[in-house]
């Protein structure tokens, strides 16, 4: 074999050894350190035997081999340079991240490998954060020596040892040592130059990146919020971290020695740019948070531009922060305890006023404005204009808006008209509560009040005035307006001065504000007190603080108007009382229906009932009725009679009508339907004792309604009868007997109500007696208290009740038949006459037939019939359970025949 071929093979073997991966290289270095410089006999035999196939001992070929070897050492120097720079990355283990190792393929592509021993790959989750001061090029010479020593181990000797004698090998090794010393000096000079150049590049790039960082930050500040967020998300994606890391690794492990300086500059530029990106991102986040805060404060100041005192800026921010932290109420407190919620609104509003959370602007209160002659001042000069001015506080508008609506349409005797006055501070408080900034839980009550004021002012309603900003800015009697209570009181005093012949009343539920008003000479009443006061007002009331009209003139004017005032008083008193009844009915019935709704929904759906519920709390009575209608088929229709849905629909329709305009007939149907609905559910459960209390409250309202009917209805009925008499006398002057006969009887609707009330009393009697019987005959009779003393007495009473229910059902079923006539009423009429509880029956069978022929009462009779059927079935079940015991005791057979 020639020397060229041997050198070619040697060069090929060297290239294979030098192109191996770095981990294998390290392992071989460890093995070679253990081997001594002079090879042992075994290693020399292996090396000689291997070299016999590769080299020949030809001295002429050694010179050619040295030339090839010199070229191989140049390649080896490049790899040594690569190994020199690899420990630089590995030595920085104290830095926040670790770079992955890389092995090279033939296409100069980087293959990332995990540095962990177990072979699992690790992801880099932190951004590469290189700083210029961390870039150090020290210890390069020692690492270079370490790399050269590792390469000059016996492995190279074993690969390049020729087959010649020991002298030739010693010459070659001496030549290699000389080459190694030259390479060492060359690398030292190159490292010093490289270190100086790299430090200069780092300083220049740092200055350049600092300038670009300032430019980017200034550019971000000038951009709007939306575009800035898009740019930030575009410039700093998560994937860019891996890209930056890959670029750094390429710069570190690049084998091209000519481009090493350029790659090093690029790596340093990327490091410095990453530093600038991190700093920019931190500043940008700070700017975004600062800008968001400033924008929130700016919007708050823009909405409340009147508050421009610099001394109140910090206080305003605290109030703004506290206004968004309103606690949430539970379902029970929202739906059941309406009265407690009203008192809570009053207390929190008073606390906010005392704490100056809703102060008016200071400059506005110190303004000096010349008032123009408006309607208020011109009407003050009119001595014949007598008004009842009622100043409405915020809590009245929120808690009793329906009362305010009725009050606006009320005609009070002794006054030309009634006017509602809304203070300026009340409108400001409603505005803040409407937006949820003062009392967030009262937001749903503030919005209707704002709409009511807006509709009245927009329609130029003369019965509602608003205090102007000019009046609100004036100082009155030296008042300093320490809180909003004083501003409301100042509004009352101003109108007393502007209208001396009018009577000013302050209506508020705030007890302390009423105390201030009474001390200041302003009559102050709550909602209930004002309702009672309006009923007792008459012409004898002192209208003026200083009488402007002589008493004789006043009497002369009032004498011809007594009848009209009396009629107005009747209508006003009736509307106010009816509104009070409806308001109390909404509270009491809402309490009972909310308990029923919650209990039945929990039974049907368990813990998911709130998610399935049609309307979420807080509820009104209309909301509850809507929920009953919506869930009737799935929940209530399964446990109650289907005809009860008609009662719910009638109750819903009449309640909506009462919210628009209350009248006598609507309130009557509301009370009757409410009692029927509660009674139907009472057969299922008492719902933790809430249903009996609600039933008692509805009965009290029915008694109050009956008293109102006896006081106010006869007058109106007499007037209607008189009008009918006048009309008939004009048309039929020859027939006066008809009018006299009609005046001696009650109107037909009142007669029907009387008949129906007797039927209801019969049902109540049967229901109460059956309850006592069931308690005595039940299994837990020892634990319950009953009005029936003994078991035998209860059994006898049960037989009588079963017979009575059977007779009533027979009479009602004959009336409800499709082809019923007058004779079918006799069965029911005979039953009413027979029993002692109805001795006061003073109507005929014809009147009963006329009553039950009406559609309204026929529907109610149908519902009552179904309730009696259920009652009869329950009685039969109870009788079957105690029949054997009664038979064993040997009671009379006549008594047991009631069971048939």
Swiss-Prot record:
Expressed weakly in testis. InterPro entries: PIN-like_dom_sf, PIN_dom, SWT1_Regulator. Residues 1-54 are annotated as: Disordered. Residues 388-515 form the PINc domain. It holds the Pfam family PIN_4. Residues 38-48 have a biased composition (Low complexity). It comes from the Eukaryota. Transmembrane segments: none annotated. CDD domains: PIN_Swt1-like. One of its GO terms (cellular component) is nucleus. Residues 1-18, 26-35 have a biased composition (Basic and acidic residues). Belongs to the SWT1 family. This is Transcriptional protein SWT1. It comes from Homo sapiens.
């Amino acid at each position: 074999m020639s020397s060229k071929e041997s050198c070619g093979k040697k060069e090929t073997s060297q290239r294979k050894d030098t192109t191996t991966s770095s981990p294998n290289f390290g392992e071989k270095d460890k093995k070679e350190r253990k081997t001594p410089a002079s090879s042992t006999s075994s290693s020399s035999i292996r090396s000689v035997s291997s070299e016999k196939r590769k080299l020949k001992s030809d001295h002429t070929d050694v010179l050619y081999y040295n030339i090839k070897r010199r070229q191989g050492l140049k390649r080896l120097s490049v790899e040594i340079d690569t190994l020199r720079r690899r420990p630089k990355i590995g030595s920085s283990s104290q830095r926040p991240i670790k770079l992955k190792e890389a092995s090279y393929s033939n296409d100069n592509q980087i293959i990332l490998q995990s540095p962990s021993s177990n072979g699992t790959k690790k992801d880099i989750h932190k951004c590469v954060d290189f700083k210029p001061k961390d870039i150090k090029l020290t210890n390069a010479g020692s690492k270079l020596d370490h790399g050269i020593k590792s390469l000059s181990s016996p492995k190279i000797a074993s690969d390049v040892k020729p087959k010649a004698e020991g002298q030739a090998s010693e010459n070659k090794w001496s030549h290699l040592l000389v080459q190694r010393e030259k390479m060492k000096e060359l690398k030292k000079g190159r490292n010093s130059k490289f270190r100086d150049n790299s430090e200069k590049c780092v300083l220049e790039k740092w200055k350049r990146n600092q300038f670009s960082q300032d430019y980017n930050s200034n550019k971000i500040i000038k951009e709007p919020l939306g575009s800035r967020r898009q740019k930030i998300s575009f410039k700093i994606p998560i994937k860019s971290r891996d890209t930056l890391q890959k670029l750094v690794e390429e710069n570190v492990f690049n084998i091209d020695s000519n481009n090493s300086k350029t790659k090093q500059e690029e790596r340093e530029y990327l490091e410095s740019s990453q530093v600038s990106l991190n700093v920019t991102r931190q500043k940008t986040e700070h700017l975004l948070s600062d800008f968001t805060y400033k924008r929130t404060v700016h919007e708050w100041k823009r909405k409340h531009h009147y508050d421009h005192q610099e001394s109140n800026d910090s206080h305003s921010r605290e109030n703004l922060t506290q206004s968004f932290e309103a606690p949430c109420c539970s379902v029970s407190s929202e739906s059941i305890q309406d009265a407690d919620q009203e008192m809570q609104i009053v207390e929190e509003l008073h606390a906010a006023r005392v704490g100056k959370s809703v102060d008016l602007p200071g400059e506005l209160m110190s303004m000096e404005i010349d008032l123009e002659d408006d309607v208020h001042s011109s009407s003050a000069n009119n001595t014949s204009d007598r008004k009842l001015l009622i100043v409405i506080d915020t809590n009245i508008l929120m808690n009793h808006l329906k009362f305010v609506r009725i009050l606006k349409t009320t005609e009070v005797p002794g006054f030309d008209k009634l006017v509602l006055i809304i203070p300026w501070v009340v409108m400001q408080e409603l505005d803040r509560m409407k937006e949820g900034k003062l009392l967030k839980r009262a937001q749903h009550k503030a919005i209707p009040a704002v709409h009511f004021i807006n509709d009245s002012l927009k329609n130029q309603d003369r019965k509602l005035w608003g205090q102007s900003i000019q009046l609100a800015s004036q100082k009155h009697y030296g008042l300093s307006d320490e809180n909003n209570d004083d501003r409301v009181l100042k509004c009352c005093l101003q109108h007393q001065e502007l209208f001396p012949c009018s009577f000013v009343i302050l209506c508020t539920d705030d007890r302390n504000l009423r105390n201030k008003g009474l001390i200041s000479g302003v009559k102050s009443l709550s909602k209930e007190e004002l309702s009672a006061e309006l009923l007792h007002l008459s012409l004898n009331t002192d209208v003026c603080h200083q009488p402007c009209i002589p008493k004789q003139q006043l009497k002369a004017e009032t004498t011809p108007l007594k009848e009209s005032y009396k009629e107005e008083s009747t209508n006003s008193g009736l509307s106010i009382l009816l509104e009070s009844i409806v308001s109390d009915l909404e509270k009491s019935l809402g309490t009972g229906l909310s308990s029923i709704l919650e209990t039945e929904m929990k039974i049907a759906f368990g813990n998911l009932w709130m998610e399935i519920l049609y309307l979420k709390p807080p509820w009104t009575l209309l909301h509850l009725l809507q929920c009953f209608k919506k869930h009737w088929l799935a929940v209530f229709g399964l446990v109650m009679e289907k005809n009860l849905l008609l009662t719910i629909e009638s109750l819903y329709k009449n309640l909506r009508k009462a919210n628009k305009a209350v009248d006598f007939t609507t309130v009557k149907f509301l009370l009757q339907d409410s009692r029927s609905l509660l009674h139907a559910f009472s057969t299922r459960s008492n719902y933790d004792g809430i249903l009996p209390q609600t039933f008692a409250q509805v009965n009290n309202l029915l008694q109050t309604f009956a008293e109102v009917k006896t006081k106010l209805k006869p007058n109106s009925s007499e007037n209607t009868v008189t009008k009918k008499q006048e009309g008939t006398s004009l048309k039929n002057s020859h027939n006066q007997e008809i009018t006299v006969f009609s005046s001696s009887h009650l109107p037909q609707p009142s007669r029907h109500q009387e008949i129906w009330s007797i039927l209801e009393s019969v049902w109540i009697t049967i229901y109460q007696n059956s309850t006592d019987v069931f308690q005595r005959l039940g299994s837990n009779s020892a634990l319950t208290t009953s009005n029936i003393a003994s078991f035998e007495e209860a059994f006898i009473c049960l037989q009588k009740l079963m017979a009575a229910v059977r007779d009533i059902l027979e009479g009602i079923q004959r009336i409800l038949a499709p082809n019923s006539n007058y004779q079918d009423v006799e069965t029911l009429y005979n039953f009413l006459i027979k029993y002692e509880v109805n001795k006061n029956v003073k109507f005929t069978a014809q009147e009963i037939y006329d009553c039950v022929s009406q559609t309204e009462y026929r529907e109610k009779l149908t519902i009552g019939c179904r309730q009696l059927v259920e009652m009869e079935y329950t009685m039969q079940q109870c009788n079957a359970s105690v029949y054997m015991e009664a038979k064993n005791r040997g009671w009379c057979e006549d008594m047991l025949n009631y069971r048939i």
